Regions:
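Conserved short alpha-helical segments that host acidic/polar catalytic motifs at enzyme active sites
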Residues: 1-246, 250, 262-269, 273-292, ...
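Glycine-rich oxoanion-binding loops at beta->alpha junctions
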Residues: 66, 70-83, 271-286, 309-345, ...
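Structural motif
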Residues: 67, 95, 293-295, 341, ...
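Acidic/histidine-rich
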Residues: 153-187, 460-487, 522, 529
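Glycine-rich, anion-gripping cofactor-binding loops and their flanking helix/strand elements
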Residues: 180-202, 206, 327-361, 500-534, ...
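Active-site phosphate/pyrophosphate-binding segments
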Residues: 260-264, 268-295, 385-514, 586-603
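Glycine-rich phosphate-binding loops that contact phosphosugars or nucleotide phosphates
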Residues: 289-423, 427-437, 471, 518-560, ...
């Protein structure tokens, strides 16, 4: 949520910042700005409402420099206006600041320290930059003023600060919001996500909470707030720079939908040996085997992936498994079992709702595993154990390949745990074969995109609402399919347990209401079919998606074969593609839906 970038050294700062901001746009895109300084007495501050493209159009060749900071915003405090866009500048025009996070005591700080300062924005960030300037006016150096300010602020932040009087130095600080330093040759960069600076360097230092960093072109000095020096290791981020490009696809979302078969195969290759045996870290296996109950904690799409994973852990490994929304769990923790193990599912690894749970359960002494796509992320670093989704960067705001990768990895872990415990159910489940069926089945469905486009047109072109129904994992996938449609096409969509419709919600069914029914569970297929009939009898336009062995000739889509427990790996491809085409046909920006951001770093 919000992306920040910075650069200092021998680079064309404007271009480095702009390109970085374009790649961070997934974190927020309601306004953007940058400040550059040529270290020879000239500087520029440019801010615009709207996308990075709008900012870019506002720049000409005079806006150049060798150091600077940039920001793309997802509004928290104050509407998306030019005044509220970052960088914020102190009234004496000495300090320039970009911020990702939320300062929770901004109002109190303003009342206590800034009574005589006129604020020009509604943001918490402006309070911080004015406070730094006010402290500097008392004779403190920029660094000490920043240090003292950090001692006063409460909340989350990744800050990058420029002191116009000393443009050979860039200051950054971090608490609860992600921030990395990228190491270059006579330059250094700052970024919320390594992805944004991969064209500059592949060597990154992930900062930790409480770090205050002083950067010059050739030095990186990291201290804690009390001035104690700390050394943080640099990691090489192995990512093909091209992974972050759209290539021939019109939208990242379509590219990422199309990548799913490859992601399935890559996951199998990553977590199995030549004999097809699952290989997970021994320490993780020991931890998992202590669990008398697993608690999967996640948000949004990742929560939906957890709902699909829970029955796998129960059936294959015999471990009772609960799935919880992170935003609820942290503040209303249920009574835990005697030996809980926590699994955090997260595409970004930065979700604040999840992190607050991680911090709490770690303090309670419970073992933790993070499954995420971003190896350098906070949740990956802070949990006891970490497994990568290895899905490659997911840029579109609507999550697709991370969801299917999460389910596939849950299946691999559940199988490994069941096998380690000698369970027959695990022995009978050939997960490697099933994931290979998933990959080929996904490919088949992707090749039927035209059919799904036509279905999307027929069902959703003009509708204001829609329903997705199913039972068991079909209910879980209904929630995810509805979320996909909602977030990128703004259709009011509901995922519903098929059997619950008749208990009230069926009252919403009218002539032509679109209802997609998922039928992959042999146990309940007949019941779900009856529920689909019931809505059709009340005028609904029903689209049935049925498993290979349950399909009837008049079902609109028949799935390729797969174990019913993994059917969401196929059914969701239909959901994703229908949502994609609906958004496209309605003329929306598929990758950047309104009001959203990909990395949700505020509670
Ligand atoms: C929807 C989507 C979100 C995220 C949610 C949690 O397409 O991506 O619902 O799943 O914000 O984010 P992560 O998975 O990064 O923890």
């Amino acid at each position: 949520m919000c992306g920040i970038v910075g650069v200092i050294g021998n680079q064309d700062a404007t271009q480095v910042l702009l390109r970085g901001l374009e790649r961070l746009e997934y974190r927020g895109y309601d306004s953007a700005g940058l400040y550059v300084n040529d270290q020879q007495g000239h500087d520029h501050l440019i801010k615009r409402v709207g996308r990075i493209r709008v900012l870019s159009e506002a720049l000409d060749e005079t806006v150049s420099g060798t150091m600077g900071i940039g920001h793309t915003r997802w509004a928290t405090n104050g509407r998306p206006t030019t005044a509220n866009a970052h960088p914020h500048v102190s009234n004496d025009e000495r300090f320039f600041l970009v911020h990702n996070g939320v300062i929770t005591n901004a109002a109190a700080l303003r009342d206590a320290y800034l009574q005589d300062v006129d604020l020009v924005s509604d943001t918490d960030t402006e309070v911080v930059v004015q406070l730094i300037a006010a402290l500097a006016r008392t004779g403190l150096t920029a660094k000490v003023a920043l240090q003292q300010t950090l001692g006063l602020v409460e909340g989350s932040y990744a800050f990058a600060l420029v002191d116009r009087l000393d443009p050979a130095t860039l200051y950054v600080a971090k608490n609860q919001s992600p921030l990395l330093i990228g190491l270059g040759d006579h330059f250094n960069v700052v970024t919320s996500d390594a992805l944004a600076m991969l064209d500059q360097t592949d060597r990154f230092v992930a900062l930790q909470d409480g770090d205050l960093v002083t950067l010059t072109a050739d030095t990186v000095t990291i201290e804690q707030l009390d001035g104690t020096p700390v050394v943080r290791p640099a990691h090489t981020v192995v990512l093909n720079d091209g992974d972050a490009e759209k290539g021939p696809y019109p939208y990242y979302m379509l590219k990422e939908i199309n990548e799913q078969p490859a992601v399935m195969r890559r996951l199998v290759a990553r977590y199995t040996d030549a004999a097809g045996q699952i290989q997970l870290p021994a320490a993780l296996m020991r931890t998992l085997q202590t669990a008398d109950r697993l608690y999967i904690v996640a948000a949004g799409t990742s929560y939906h992936a957890g709902l699909v994973g829970a029955p796998l852990f129960e059936q294959l490994a015999g471990v009772p498994t609960e799935v919880h929304l992170a935003s609820e769990f942290g503040y209303h923790q249920p009574l835990l079992s005697a030996h809980p193990v926590f699994i955090f599912l997260s595409q970004s690894g930065e979700t604040a709702d999840i992190r607050q749970v991680l911090v709490k359960v770690k303090a309670q002494g419970h073992p933790t595993l993070t499954i995420t796509n971003v190896e350098t992320s906070t949740l990956a670093r802070e949990a006891d154990h970490f497994l990568t989704l290895a899905a490659g960067p997911e840029i579109a705001v609507a999550s697709t390949k991370a969801y299917t990768a999460q389910i596939a990895l849950e299946a691999l872990v559940a199988k490994a745990l069941g096998a380690a415990q000698g369970r027959a159910a695990a022995a009978d489940f050939d997960v490697v074969h099933q994931l290979s069926l998933a990959a080929s089945g996904q490919q088949t469905l992707i090749e039927e995109a035209d059919v799904l486009h036509a279905a999307a047109r027929d069902l959703f072109a003009t509708t204001r609402n829609a329903f997705f129904i199913g039972r068991g994992v079909d209910h879980a996938v209904s929630l995810e399919a509805a979320l996909k449609l909602k977030e990128i096409s703004y259709v009011q969509a509901e995922g519903f347990a098929a059997g619950e419709l008749k208990h009230g919600t069926i009252a919403l069914i009218e002539q032509e209401t679109p209802v997609v029914a998922f039928i992959t569970d042999p146990l309940t297929a007949a019941h779900t079919r009856s529920n689909a009939e019931e809505v059709a009898a009340r005028g609904a336009k029903v689209f049935r998606i049925a498993a290979h062995d349950l399909a009837r000739p008049d079902d609109q889509l028949q799935l390729p074969p797969i174990d019913a427990r993994l059917s969401p790996l196929l059914t969701i491809i239909a959901g994703q593609l229908m949502a994609y085409y609906t958004s496209l046909d309605r003329g929306y920006d598929v990758d950047r839906p309104r009001n959203l951001a990909k990395s949700v770093t505020v509670e």
